Amino acid sequence: MNCSLRCRFFLILVMAGFSFFVALFGMRLMHKMAEFAYFEREHVVALSKVYYELHKKEINISFIVGQVQRARRQTTAVNSLWKGDKALLRLLGKGLILELSEASEIKLGLLERYASSIYKDGLNPGHIEEMKRLVSWPYTNSNRFGIEIADISKRVKAYVYFLVVSINCLFFVVIFLLMKKTRSSIDEIVHVMNDMSRGDLTYRTIPSNDEVGKMQSSIIAMGAGVSALIESIKHIQGDLFNSAGEALNISQSTSNDICDQAGKIDEFVSALSQISFAITETSNAANKSSALSSEGRQLAVHGQKAIETAVSSINALSQRVNDSHVAIKCIEADIAKIGKIIEIIDQITDQTNLLALNAAIEAAHAGEAGKGFAVVADEVRSLAQRTNNSTYEIQAMIASLNKGIFFALGVMGDCVVESKNSVNAASEASRSIEKIVDSVSQVMLQIAQVATASEEQSAVVKDMLDNANIIREIAAGVELGSRRISEVNTHR
């Protein structure tokens, strides 16, 4: 039992694995025996049906073949055992099962092939006798096989139970002994630690070679080291008392210097407080300026948007005026065409008057016969005169309309020029506002930089104040320590 903890745990694991393997193998073998018993019942039933079928007057060959195949399942299951299982059966004195199974497999194979080769029309008494002879041996020995199966099942179950119980008992005994050995070593370590806690560093023991023994050796070495350390501390204590006097003088001098530095630190803290207040005021003013600049920038942006809207409206109006100018030009062209048509009508009227005059002259020459023609000529001349008067009126109206169109074109041209001037002025104003917005943005950026710098300076000053306060507290602590050292050395 004088082995390491690792060896003990490995031994426990090996025994547990072996116990599990034995139990698993036994359960498998018992399952095989139960399977063989089931196939044996199938075997007996199938052979009985074959035997009774052969004694009938009308024999069904396909039924016999099916039952023989059913009976062969038992022999096939036995013959498919592992070599280890077969060796175990022979070791237990049950090799007869394997021999009976092999012989029955041969007989049933011959019977199946023989029955499959017989056709119904060719069946004769000789075939029946041959099949009876082939089935008689498996049928006769099936009882022996069943007895052997039942016996081996009982024997395997008993052996498995015995092995499992024995191995588990041995397993628990080994665990108990290992725990007892390990616990005694741990109790010894606890005893050594208790003695060391009471100041006894002289305990000695003979450690073992396992992990617990190594722990004991380490604890003993630690006790020796602690003992040597205590002796060294005793020697150092004397040197400390000698150095204490020198430390007293140094501490008194340091205390005086610290008192002087404390006054200067107070003045420095006061100056830093004033600087911090001024930086805070600057930061607040920068923030207010940033807010005002932001409002001014927003107003400028709104004004720029309004100007852009006005420019868009003026451009739309200018486009409409241009469209009207084009439409009036088209009207002017149409009026010119009308004037040409009126000129043609004047020419036609003049020709008509001339023709009417010639007709009247010819009617006068004709006398009475030309009176009716003279009346028509007068009417034609009258119509030509009215047409001529109408053309004069139309020409007067066209002249008046041309004057109005000329005036409208002039006004529209002025409107276009004015709208372009307005657009240019608005664009110039928009560019100016855009420059203002850019300038305000730069101002806001500079103000933000000023505010950021002020905040950073404020943070730096705050850190300096904190550090100064810490230095002051340290100085006060050092002064207090110097006084205590002086008091300790005075009482010593």
From Swiss-Prot:
Every Methyl-accepting transducer domain range: 236-472
Organism: Ectopseudomonas oleovorans
GO terms under cellular component: membrane
Top-level division of the source organism's lineage: Bacteria
Subcellular location: Membrane
TM spans (from-to): 9-29, 159-179
Membrane-topology annotation of the record: Multi-pass membrane protein
UniProt cross-references to CDD domains, sorted A to Z: HAMP (cd06225), MCP_signal (cd11386)
InterPro entries, A to Z: Chemotax_Me-accpt_rcpt (IPR004090), HAMP_dom (IPR003660), MCPsignal_dom (IPR004089)
Primary gene name: alkN
Role description: Chemotactic-signal transducers respond to changes in the concentration of attractants and repellents in the environment, transduce a signal from the outside to the inside of the cell, and facilitate sensory adaptation through the variation of the level of methylation.
Pathway the protein contributes to: Hydrocarbon metabolism; alkane degradation
Keywords for this protein: Membrane, Plasmid, Transducer, Transmembrane, Transmembrane helix
SMART domains: MA
Keyword Cell cycle tagged: no
Protein name per UniProt: Putative methyl-accepting chemotaxis AlkN
Signal peptide annotation: none
Record-level Gene Ontology MF annotations: transmembrane signaling receptor activity
Domain HAMP: 180-231
GO BP of this protein: alkane catabolic process; chemotaxis; signal transduction
Pfam (any one): HAMP
Family of the protein in this entry: Belongs to the methyl-accepting chemotaxis (MCP) protein family.
